[in-house]
Amino acid sequence: MPKYYCDYCKSYLTHDTMSVRKSHLQGRNHIKFYCDYYEAKAKETNIWNPSSIPYEITLEKLNRYSDAKKSNGSSEDNMDIDKKENSSDHNKGNVVNHSDAGNDNDDDDDEMIFLPPPPNLSGLPLPPPAVYNNQKEYQKAILRQTLTKS
C-alpha cells in the first residue's frame, strides 16, 4: 500500500486512508507548517507586509474585557449566566411579554436585532425581498416556540 507524503510536514503517513489524511490535515503541527510555508513564500515574493494584516491581535484588544471590568468597579464575573438572568440591566432588550407570544404583533420587531443583508455579487441581481422577510418570520417563530415551551 503506498504511503501518503505531506510536502508541508516533510513526512510520510503510516496509512493512506481518508481518515488518516483528514486527521493529519486538521492537526496542529500540519497547520503550523502549512502557515509557515505560505508565509515564507509570501516573503520571497515581497507580498508579505506584516503592518497590513487586517486581523492583527494587539494587547489593547486582548485586555479590553479586563479594562472594562475595572472601569465598572464591579468584582462580579460578567460571564456568569446565572447572575445575568437575575439582573434587570442586562435583560432589558431580551424580555418579551409572554401574553403577546401567541399574537402576530409586530411590536417585538424593535427588540430583535437583524443584520443587514450581505452584499450581492457584481453582475448578479439582488435576492428577492421575501428572503429577508422569511428570515424575520423564522426568527419570530423560533422565539415564540422557545418562549411557549419554557
From Swiss-Prot:
Paired cysteines (S-S): none
Domain of life: Eukaryota
Region (Disordered): 66-132
Single GO molecular function: U1 snRNA binding
PROSITE patterns: ZF_MATRIN
Subcellular location: Nucleus
Feature: compositional bias, Acidic residues: 103-112
Residue ranges crossing the lipid bilayer per the database entry: none
Principal location listed in the UniProt entry: nucleus
Pro residues composition-biased segments: 115-130
Pfam families: zf-U1
Function: Component of the spliceosomal U1 snRNP, which is essential for recognition of the pre-mRNA 5' splice-site and the subsequent assembly of the spliceosome. U1-C is directly involved in initial 5' splice-site recognition for both constitutive and regulated alternative splicing. The interaction with the 5' splice-site seems to precede base-pairing between the pre-mRNA and the U1 snRNA. Stimulates commitment or early (E) complex formation by stabilizing the base pairing of the 5' end of the U1 snRNA and the 5' splice-site region.
Complex and partners: U1 snRNP is composed of the 7 core Sm proteins B/B', D1, D2, D3, E, F and G that assemble in a heptameric protein ring on the Sm site of the small nuclear RNA to form the core snRNP, and at least 3 U1 snRNP-specific proteins U1-70K, U1-A and U1-C. U1-C interacts with U1 snRNA and the 5' splice-site region of the pre-mRNA.
Family: Belongs to the U1 small nuclear ribonucleoprotein C family.
Protein name, as recorded: U1 small nuclear ribonucleoprotein C
Taxonomic source organism: Candida albicans (strain SC5314 / ATCC MYA-2876)
